[in-house]
């Protein structure tokens, strides 16, 4: 058990977004170092954009960008993208995919993934909510804080669709409210302090 904890000691940064999230992801990645020492997982609940992110985002970071597949190893200094119509979980340092649990209405893939992290990841957790409709992710933020994680919302006036950041802020469980550029700086500060 001790060996697994040492292996999984690096942080995971979950970045959840939807409509308008692409701009936020780009601004964030452009300001993160390539040797950050954390895994970046982008959980976008807008299905059509999610499938294209692994093609678009490599233009904005030198970190490898991968579309998540079943049992893909989680590695630091990589950007991972959730595939469409899937719930994402972690288990034994791997990603696990399941059929989406909420196929109608607004999906809750961000909430599902963050809850899995709180139960199955030993390293530091940093959860970021950026531009998007609805309130996906907000319900899991207090759980992230309960396990010692850090929560960040995009400053609503810097988001093209502020619903998701506003819902996150309304949860009462947000540590920082920042622009994407400042989110990147804060993530770097947190990871370096670990």
Residue ranges of model-derived segments:
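Strand-loop microenvironment adjacent to phosphate/nucleotide-handling motifs in alpha/beta enzyme folds
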Residues: 1-194
């Amino acid at each position: 058990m001790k060996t697994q904890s040492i292996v999984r000691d690096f942080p995971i940064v979950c970045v959840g977004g939807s409509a308008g999230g692409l701009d936020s992801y780009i601004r964030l990645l452009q300001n993160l170092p390539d040797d950050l020492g954390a895994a970046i997982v982008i959980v976008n609940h807008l299905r059509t954009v999610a499938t294209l992110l692994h093609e678009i985002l490599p233009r904005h970071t030198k970190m490898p960008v991968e579309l998540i597949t079943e049992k893909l190893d989680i590695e630091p200094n990589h950007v991972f993208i959730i595939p469409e119509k899937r719930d994402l979980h972690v288990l034994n340092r791997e990603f696990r995919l399941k059929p989406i649990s909420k196929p109608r209405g607004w999906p809750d893939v961000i909430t599902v993934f963050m809850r899995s992290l709180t139960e199955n990841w030993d390293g530091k957790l940093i959860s970021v909510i950026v531009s998007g409709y609805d309130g996906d992710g907000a319900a899991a933020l207090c759980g992230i804080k309960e396990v010692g994680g850090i929560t960040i919302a995009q400053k609503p006036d810097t988001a093209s669709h502020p619903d998701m950041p506003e819902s996150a802020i309304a949860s009462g469980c947000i540590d920082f409210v920042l622009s994407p550029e400042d989110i990147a700086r804060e993530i770097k500060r947190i990871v370096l302090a670990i």
